[in-house]
């Protein structure tokens, strides 16, 4: 490749093993390669996230081409970083940590001056006292050398307001070029209150619909099975209660995790307790393939919901966290539960009766992708 080739970059790519994050990266790569066909695309992994090498190799085998770069610098050996990892949540000063990092490390980011545009990976970003500091500090460092920083649709937890004042967040998110696209109504409402100009879009994974339709259903599976894909390392009893209720309703249940590094130990324990099969797909494509052969997907993972939607199968969301709660509201889902322990035979019968309505609501939600941003350039 010639040294003077035009380049764009993706930063904060999450390669830790969540197939939803790999789907985000694939959607971004396909969108950007279509918009910038003559450009080299460099991908920088998230500075403080691990890399699932096996699933990353599978992603490289199946996905579009790109140049993988080394992680950008970040200092995780500071007193702040240690304090931020403690459950006691000592009083923290994240802004001071951000600018301390910028002062010490900004020269290392001069290489970003070579890019025509830089794109922040979509998804749930700026989370907590550690990751938010890492991301904001990185953006400030890059901004010194290149102000053309855009972001694919992302969401932010309301808890960020416990770390930063509103005017501070306005300044920090002001590092992003407009349009700032958020992927749900909850984040949009929070940004409106803070005076941060944004537009509501959809997770960029919705842009993979045509590709998803070409994926063959998984062989050797029974169509009447219910796929239970509920995450929660700290609520084992509730997870088991949900599985038991589905089994007691006379249905066949199989477990599936979209993020094996996080859920693997729990899903194996549940599998052993109930003597049921479990699956840990290596790719988002394999996940869609599994979802195409079932009667219902029960999940609290946002990308479980989105990939289930791409598979055009029925969904029962478990809205025990903000992301599925936002999905339920935005997609106007007729049935959901607040916790897996609230699943019961009566609810499942209602879901059966409303399968057509559920699938139609999901189709309507997907169709919004043609009218809303799934990237920072969709409507330009």
For the regions a language model picked out, list residue spans one by one.
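Active-site anion-handling motifs in enzyme catalytic cores
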Residues: 1-380
